[in-house]
Amino acid sequence: RDFCLSRGLGDVYKRQAQDSISFKSIRPKPKKKDSITLTSRDYKRISIFRDTTAVDTTLTLRAMYRQNPIRRDMFAYVPFQNMGQTYTSLAYDYRSVGISPDFGMRGNRFYFSQAQQIPYFYLPTPMIEFSFKSGISQGQMLQSFFSANLTPEFNLFIRYNALRSLGDYKNILSSVGSFSAGFSYYSKNKKYLAMAHYANEEVNRQENGGLLYPEQFGQGDDQFRNRARLDVALSGVNSEENLKRYFLQHQYNFLPASHREGGSEILLKHQVEYQSRNYYHSQSEMASNGVLGQSFTLKSLRDKHSLRELTNRLGAELSLPYLGKTFLYGKSYFYNYFAKGIFVDNNGNFIPHQIKNTDYGIGVQWKKNYKGFAINAQGEQMILGKLLGTEIAGDLSYTFDEKNKVIAGVNVTSKMPNFNFLLYQSDYKNYNWYHLDDFSKENIQTIYGSAYTQWGNLSLDITNINNYTYFQLQPASSGEKNQSKPAQYTGNIQYLKLVGEREFLLGKWGLENTLMYQQVLQDNANVFNVPSLTTRNTLYFTTFMFKKAMFLQTGLTFKYFTNYYAYEYNPLLADFQVQTQEKIGNYSVTDFFLNAKVRTMRIFFTVEHLEALLGKYNYYAAPNQPYRDWKVRLGIIWYFFK
């Protein structure tokens, strides 16, 4: 799991100054005493867990950090050179794991959503959102969204995102597209609630395998300032992954409104999700340099792996004022992961091409709020099937006031590794395996705590991992050069992550600081690697201009992480592999930004990576994958409210 930076409660209070002017310029001044004034806080975003937040139209550092194709804070990530490529993760989050194996191909996961990440809305008027960002060399990103409440009970939404970027290096053209549409309905008598959506998402990009001769980049010769002249490992290689999902969650409340005073409810809940995923690796010409080893064919190849999943969850929830909410449910999980056909290895052994079954399980969830305390606990156990799995999780939080909150929790999970660790088939000879019978479950135990205060935020995670599963790059001396094999580390890995945030304000100036310290104990195995120190510091100035018609924000952002054995990207697997030959890191990235907000439009102007102008070419996103040179980027997010 990737690290997700939680900024806590602070941004809520920063937004209030801007919220009051959010709609001034797009609405006529009220002429009647009974007219209603709306702000962005009246436009609600709702999760499938019924958590509600306001649509954010303010200009904050958080908005700038998330102005990228995957809408995430980039503190714990290093992007590859081109938009649409993958990201190196600098930290990991095990607070919520899940008990089902993932598809794999983790290099593409950033561009695919999960059902719980799709938001629903309650809007007093229709809303449109456009987001734009210039690409690398040629291309751009455009994200568009429309939502409206046709009635107070029924909301629908449509979202389309597209990205196409050429990149500076050869053979890294990227194209990403996603479409989603859905609705939510809450009956007038508040007895029936439904949320549903359809998603169709795709990633298609060329793969160049990284630099063939890294010294061409590091020496800084003038002839290689044009990055398209650098030699790359692969040509004619394309990877593609697509996802389609149908999702419905609905519930019925048996108690009439007159019996629901005090929070009493008896609910029947049902959730169904069908998802199909396909991954293709195609190659029109075989690499003569043996980057991926020997193949069964000298002509073109096209590997394919697919996953079909159908998950059903049905249960009943009892809510009582003094007992909280208790939800008991049964679950079925159908899965069919398959490759193109039965394979016979060099020893004459048959390798199955499919992992298919239906697993059954039970689960319970309990929530209770009492005088500032909030308790959340859940457990799930798959009891019949092949993959099985167990998860027990809980957290306790206490809210002192609007600006101060603490939370502590635990998560214990046992699950099978991702499907591409268990089964993979390829026309490359050394990329064929089946490990369903000999790989053990990964066992993960995490305890964590966070404090969100008016002075700053602090979080601590301590994780123990047993049977950690990874791809291991084989050394040249083994005779299997450039082969990546799945393996399990049967020892224990202890992983500590400590993150602190503090902001200092003086008049119109601000200095925001985020510092992350990490330590891993693994008996010198070097299979789980992260930088020990990562820091980001942003010095900025803010002011209103033109009689408060525009809000201006400008400054510098500095980021640095210590060197470590970063995972290497494997273009055949679309995944990352462990290597211990090359460290990356120990370089800084400074960006200049000039941002502005006019009405409900936010403009982001950035000059990225100023250090690249100094001519020291030691900046890598992953082994053999350089980070970006200095770039001038433009981004826009624009909301329209009728």
Question: What role is predicted for each listed range?
Answer:
Residues 1, 116, 590-591:
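A generic local structural motif
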Residues 1-16:
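Single conserved hydrophobic/aromatic residue that forms the stacking wall/gate
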Residues 8-10, 167, 635:
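Glycine-centered flexibility sites
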Residues 12, 140, 386-387:
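Loop/helix-junction capping segments adjacent to catalytic residues or to phosphate/diphosphate-binding pockets
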Residues 17-241, 255-263, 397-403, 624-630, ...:
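Membrane-proximal, glycine/serine-rich, low-complexity loop/turn segments characteristic
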Residues 111-112, 140, 230-232, 248, ...:
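Short linear interaction motifs
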Residues 123-125, 240-285, 299-642:
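Exposed, low-structure sequence patches enriched in small/polar residues
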Residues 212, 219-223, 290, 294, ...:
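Solvent-exposed loop segments that connect transmembrane elements
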